Amino acid sequence: DDGIIKNHKARSLSETNIERLQEIRLHGGNREMISEELQLECHKKENVSYTDTYGIIDPDKPAPTITSGCTIISKGRYCHPTQNRGLSIREAARLQSFDDKFEFQGNMGEMSLQIGNAVPPKLAQASGKVIINYMGLYEDYLEAQTKGVITP
């Protein structure tokens, strides 16, 4: 392990999107707090939903559902809690419980898709243990694990 955190790269933002984030931070909330001149035309219509677009992650609350748009600030509440940027690939992966040693391949869109479409590894592991236990094979699993045949 070389100590380098892989895939810790966020998408570049336009000056307009940086201004939007600054206004949201100043006024709190989400895209509804953006001044009219910075709002997208589609957001100016009445009864428009998806108010989480351009939303800032609250570090004191559970993370939003991680989707394939997890690095795009206009796709949901995917703005970094303290910095004017979206989530990096690594931050999104951590929210999905991927170990930092796991390295994603491809461009930003492909890596975001891999993360957003994945079953979180810790959820998969916990589910697998429940299924194994349910099937009455838990003892065999533990024995195989101690022999190094299966890793946790």
Where does each model-flagged region fall?
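C-terminal target-recognition/interaction regions appended to catalytic cores
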Residues: D1-P152
